[in-house]
Regions:
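Short, charged, amphipathic alpha-helical segments
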Residues: 11, 36-44, 95-99, 121-129
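Alpha-helical bundle segments that constitute or directly flank the non-heme di-iron/ferroxidase center
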Residues: 1-31, 90-118, 134
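Preference for long, well-ordered alpha-helical segments
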Residues: 100-152
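Charge-rich, acidic-biased intrinsically disordered regions
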Residues: 44-45, 64-82, 121-130, 147-152
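Conserved alpha-helical segments that form or flank metal/cofactor-binding pockets of metalloenzymes
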Residues: 37-72, 138-146
Length: 152
């Protein structure tokens, strides 16, 4: 079965959501407790959005749920660990979480260029908003860490 452009766009959103959640879950133990506590509500909401999006895309676009890209995930995990050897582990993680958000924002933006049912658009808007809020939180913590390094 071939996918049309809007199905491809929505498939990309589903994959980006799955990758984002998977990356966070795989690396949560590496985050300081304060960072983990700050970021968890965003990812908890993201689980809800992912489930809602899967339901709506299955209903309206005949798309099946996407899993995270395991090979890419393994590569990202290894690369992150290597970078953490020479840099601050939390800073590396924040930068990589920001990159995950950029990928998700781009996928959402692309999906918004296609005609979609209102129920899917509503969930996409929730994803976009969640993504923007998490980016602000990540930058807030990134700036806080930079300020602490300068103070030392």
């Amino acid at each position: 079965m071939f996918l049309d452009n809007r199905q491809v766009a929505m498939d990309s959103v589903q994959e980006a959501l799955a990758d984002s959640l998977d990356y966070f879950e795989d690396n949560a133990e590496r985050l300081r407790p304060g960072l983990l506590k700050a970021f968890e509500p965003f990812y908890a909401r993201r689980v809800e959005l992912k489930q809602a999006l899967e339901t709506e895309t299955r209903k309206h676009l005949s798309l099946m749920p996407r899993d995270a890209d395991v090979e890419r995930d393994d590569y990202m995990w290894l690369w992150s660990r290597l970078k953490s050897i020479v840099s601050n582990d939390n800073q590396v993680l924040i930068n990589e979480l920001l990159e995950q958000e950029r990928v998700l924002m781009q996928a959402c933006s692309t999906a918004f260029t296609h005609p979609l049912p209102d129920s899917i658009e509503k969930v996409l808007e929730g994803c976009f908003s969640n993504c923007r809020s998490l980016i602000r939180e990540l930058y807030r913590h990134q700036m806080g860490q930079a300020a602490r390094r300068r103070a030392v």
